[in-house]
């Protein structure tokens, strides 16, 4: 997938997942439910947002700062899975799958984010087709990226992998 397509998907999500857009699309009752349940959270650099193995309680949308998703590998060494930037949403994959988090999320800088409880996020996906479509695009993009990474790691020699960096 091209970088232009990735940017278009991220921009679509940003247009759909915000107070103004929700107010335009949701019923007044649903909008109030959203507004009353979301929380603004702050984390300092190196704070843990959620732990690997923890039960998801909701999703986080990063408004300011940067974070990382990592998994502890062999001998306790952390492997960074991806970086989280402003506008990104995390926690949804485990929530949608009904499983515990498969990675740790940690603030790389001081961050501010919106936390949306699981029940409200799931409800919004049910009642808001635009949000559902934006999430479907986001998940599909990430699945494609994962497939590309697996192919890259499995089919290329170390020399070929280093040449592409």
Ranges and model annotations:
Residues 121-122:
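A generic structural signal for short hydrophobic patches within well-formed alpha-helices
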Residues 112-113:
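All-alpha effector-binding/dimerization core of bacterial HTH-type transcriptional repressors
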Residues 41-43, 105, 143:
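Short, flexible turn/loop "capping" segments at secondary-structure junctions
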Residues 1-45, 89, 94-95:
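Cyclic nucleotide-binding regulatory module and flanking cytosolic helices
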Residues 108, 126-165:
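Polybasic "coupling" helices that flank or enter modular domains
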Residues 22, 47-109:
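Cyclic nucleotide-binding regulatory domains
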């Amino acid at each position: 997938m091209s970088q232009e397509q990735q940017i278009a998907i991220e921009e679509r999500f940003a247009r759909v997942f915000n107070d103004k857009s929700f107010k335009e699309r949701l019923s007044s009752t649903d909008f109030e439910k959203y507004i009353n349940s979301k929380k603004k959270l702050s984390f300092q650099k190196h704070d843990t947002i959620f732990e690997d193995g923890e039960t998801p309680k909701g999703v986080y949308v990063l408004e300011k700062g940067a974070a990382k998703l990592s998994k502890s590998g062999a001998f306790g060494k952390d492997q960074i899975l991806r970086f989280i930037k402003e506008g990104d949403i995390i926690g949804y994959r485990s929530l949608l799958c009904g499983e515990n988090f498969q990675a740790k999320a940690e603030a790389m800088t001081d961050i501010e984010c919106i936390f949306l409880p699981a029940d409200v996020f799931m409800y919004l996906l049910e009642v808001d087709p635009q949000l559902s479509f934006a999430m479907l695009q986001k998940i599909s993009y990430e699945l494609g990226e994962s497939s590309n990474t697996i192919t890259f790691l499995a089919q290329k020699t170390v020399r070929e992998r280093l040449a592409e960096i």
